[in-house]
């Protein structure tokens, strides 16, 4: 890897230099060729293993942990920071630079009495979900590798430590801006320095002046809305949408007790610490805006309040438009720009409202009838929209409700000239395979009990091609067995 050190060299006082501690008996549990290509790597090798397990120093690495704060479950915590993630620097790839971080690399000044380690189960889950979301075209950080060890660590019981090698276009979070806004007591120098750095590194088309700051925040609002629209469309629940877990680039990261929906449930909670359902699946769009408002507050020294409010007011529209774009592709609705006759803005808005109503009625039917979200949407790839019968009806208990919806659906889709092509388009928009919690758990158990990572590798391969039939992997598309239904994870890692 070839590193540059822009954050380390230009933002002194925004981090603490700290060196990772090695893990014993390191071994590859998983490796992503796709992620490796992003930073110009090819195959894993023994020397790289020793570098990424902190047994050898990586040439050109600086090793540091960033400081930030954040709102956690709605309450402000004035000092957080990287408690178990140590950044090596920005690795230069063929199409840009990516931060390389060792998640589980050991204690830092921000560990808050923790050991700075990650347990194998959380490292494996982060590796797999990074692969899964990337293949689903959801904006996300990546995981280059997961490295196992025989180093014991204590959580509720003894487990083994592991390291996830995370790649991110940036590790700058909403919480970075909160920290320097609240801790500098009205001195905007460091806040301005951070905004300028963020723009120069990641928004180079913008200027570092009042006009540039205004446009930058608008683009942050837009990218956040787009990310969450993607989450809602694929049934992804993040679980811990604290502001310190929000990327300034609108990429998904900081994976903890996440889950994909099995049975559709608007109020699904995947984090057993979320007693009030603050971060429930259906709450995510609203929390995205709440978090953006916390970010906007920090920017008041450099951006006019009216401009911040104007940008925030675009969030809901952008979220809905992105969600509509994705759901129309899933259900086979023509996009407004595909219409043979141009329609004006008022007609587009009316069509959008009707489409949202149809989508909401469908998800309502899925919830009422306790149906699997992913499998139900995949059925549209076998549907002839001109046929009076839909196989989706066979799963319904509320037949009258479905029939009413289906008639409206057929009217919206209209006549389809080439049914086979239409079905292929639906299959390219609706995945057959997702990372179900029980599948990840089976891979983890195989490693824990037998040191066998074959299930992990099989699952990784499957998730890299979620839209393909992969008929030999059919069992992975089934609804969870009884023991795997509604698994709720903890933040313990």
UniProtKB/Swiss-Prot annotation:
Mg(2+) binds at residues 245, 254. Disulfide bonds: none annotated. Its EC number is 2.7.7.-, 2.7.7.108. The lineage of its organism: Bacteria, Pseudomonadati, Pseudomonadota, Gammaproteobacteria, Alteromonadales. Nucleotidyltransferase involved in the post-translational modification of proteins. It can catalyze the addition of adenosine monophosphate (AMP) or uridine monophosphate (UMP) to a protein, resulting in modifications known as AMPylation and UMPylation. It catalyses: L-seryl-[protein] + ATP = 3-O-(5'-adenylyl)-L-seryl-[protein] + diphosphate; L-threonyl-[protein] + ATP = 3-O-(5'-adenylyl)-L-threonyl-[protein] + diphosphate; L-tyrosyl-[protein] + ATP = O-(5'-adenylyl)-L-tyrosyl-[protein] + diphosphate; L-histidyl-[protein] + UTP = N(tele)-(5'-uridylyl)-L-histidyl-[protein] + diphosphate. This is Protein nucleotidyltransferase YdiU. Belongs to the SELO family. Its cofactor is Mg(2+); Mn(2+). It comes from the Bacteria. NCBIfam families: PRK00029.1 (NF000658). Pfam families: SelO. Keywords: ATP-binding, Magnesium, Manganese, Metal-binding, Nucleotide-binding, Nucleotidyltransferase, Transferase. HAMAP family: YdiU_SelO. InterPro entries: SelO (IPR003846). The gene is ydiU. The active site is at residue 244. It is an enzyme of class 2 (transferase). Signal peptide: none annotated. GO terms for molecular function: AMPylase activity; ATP binding; magnesium ion binding. ATP binds at residues 81, 83-84, 103, 115-116, 166, 173, 254. It comes from Shewanella frigidimarina (strain NCIMB 400).
């Amino acid at each position: 890897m070839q590193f540059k050190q822009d954050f380390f060299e230009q933002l002194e006082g925004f981090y603490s230099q700290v060196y990772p501690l090695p893990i014993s008996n390191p071994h590859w549990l998983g490796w992503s060729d796709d992620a490796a290509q992003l930073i110009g790597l090819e195959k894993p090798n023994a020397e790289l293993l020793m570098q990424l397990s902190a047994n050898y120093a990586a040439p050109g690495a600086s090793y540091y942990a960033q400081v930030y704060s954040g709102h956690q479950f709605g309450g402000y915590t004035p000092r957080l920071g990287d408690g178990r993630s140590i950044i090596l620097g920005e690795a230069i790839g063929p199409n840009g630079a990516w931060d390389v971080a060792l998640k589980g690399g050991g204690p830092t000044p921000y560990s808050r009495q923790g050991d700075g380690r990650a347990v194998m189960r959380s490292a494996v889950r982060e590796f797999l979900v990074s692969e899964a979301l990337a293949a689903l075209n959801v904006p996300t950080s990546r995981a280059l590798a997961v490295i196992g060890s025989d180093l014991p660590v204590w959580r509720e019981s003894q487990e083994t430590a592991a390291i996830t090698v995370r790649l991110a276009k940036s590790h700058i979070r909403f919480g970075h801006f909160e920290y320097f806004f609240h801790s500098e007591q009205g001195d905007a120098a460091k806040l301005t320095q951070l905004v300028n750095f963020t723009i120069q590194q990641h928004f180079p088309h913008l200027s570092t002046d009042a006009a540039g700051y205004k446009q930058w925040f608008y683009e942050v609002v837009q990218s956040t809305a787009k990310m969450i629209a993607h989450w809602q469309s694929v049934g992804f629940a993040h679980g811990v949408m604290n502001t310190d877990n929000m990327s300034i680039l609108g990429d998904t990261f900081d994976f903890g007790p996440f889950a994909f929906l099995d049975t559709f449930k608007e109020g699904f909670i995947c984090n057993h610490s979320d007693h009030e359902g603050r971060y429930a699946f259906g709450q995510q769009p609203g929390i995205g805006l709440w978090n953006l408002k916390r970010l906007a507050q920090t920017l008041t020294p450099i951006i006019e309040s009216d401009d911040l409010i104007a940008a925030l007011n675009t969030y809901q529209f952008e979220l809905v438009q992105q969600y509509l774009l994705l759901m129309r592709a899933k259900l086979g609705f023509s996009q407004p720009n595909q219409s043979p006759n141009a329609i004006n803005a008022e007609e587009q808005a009316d069509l959008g409202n009707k489409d949202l109503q149809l989508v909401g009625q469908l998800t309502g039917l899925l919830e009422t009838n306790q149906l699997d979200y992913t499998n139900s949407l995949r059925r549209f790839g076998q549907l002839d929209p001109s046929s009076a019968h839909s196989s989706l009806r066979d799963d319904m208990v509320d037949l009258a409700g479905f029939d009413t919806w289906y008639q409206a659906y057929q009217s919206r889709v209209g006549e389809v000239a080439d049914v086979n092509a239409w079905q292929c388009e639906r299959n390219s928009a609706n995945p057959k395979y997702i990372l179900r919690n029980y599948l990840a758990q089976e891979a983890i158990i195989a490693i824990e009990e037998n040191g066998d990572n074959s299930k992990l590798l099989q699952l990784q391969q499957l998730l890299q091609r979620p839209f393909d039939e992969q008929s030999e992997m059919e069992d992975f598309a089934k609804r969870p067995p009884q023991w795997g239904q509604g698994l709720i994870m903890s933040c313990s890692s």
